[in-house]
Amino acid sequence: FKVIVNEEAKAGETILNKAKVDDTVNPPEEPEVPITPEEPITPRVKEGKLTATKTVNNAKPKLGEAIEYTISFRNTIENGVLNKVVITDQLPKGLTYVKDSLTSVGDEPKPTSLTEANGTITAEYPSITDTKERSIRFKVIVNEEAKAGETILNKAKVDDTVNPPEEPEVPITPEEPITPRVK
C-alpha cells in the first residue's frame, strides 16, 4: 500500500510505521516498518515563507527625543523551515543609536548574534521551524542632522537567503522641540 506524508510531519523527524497482526488466537505481533533501521522515512524540508514588519513608538518625535523601533518577523508556513534569518537596519542620517538599547523579544530560538556597529543594527537567528513572531527592539535619538518637518524613512532588511528579502520601513517626521517661555 502507499501513504502520503501529510502536513503534520515535521521536516527532519523520522516517522515509524507500526502494524499489528492479530489472528485472535495467538498473541498479536507488532512488526515495525521499516524493518531495516537504515531506511527510515524522513520527510523533506518544506520551505517556510517570511513576513516582516517595522514599527516605531512615536512617528512625530521632537528633535533630540529618543524613540523605539521594533522589527518583527515570522514564518507563515506551518511545519515550514526558515533556514537562517538575518535582520539588518542601517540607520539613516538624523538618527543616532542609543547604546545598549538593542534587545530581542519572542520565543526560542533567540538570535545567535545581536549587534550594533557604526549605525548598523544586525540580528542573526538560526533555523526557525514554527510560526511564532520574533522581534528586535532598539532606541535611537533624533539628532541635530534631522530637520523639523522633513520625513526620515528608516528601512530594515529581513532575509532568510531563500525567499525574496522583506524590507519593512516606517517614516517619522521630527518636530521642533518645545522651548519653555520665559516669564
Task: Kindly label every feature range from the protein language model.
Residues F1-K183:
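Exported/extracytosolic protein signature
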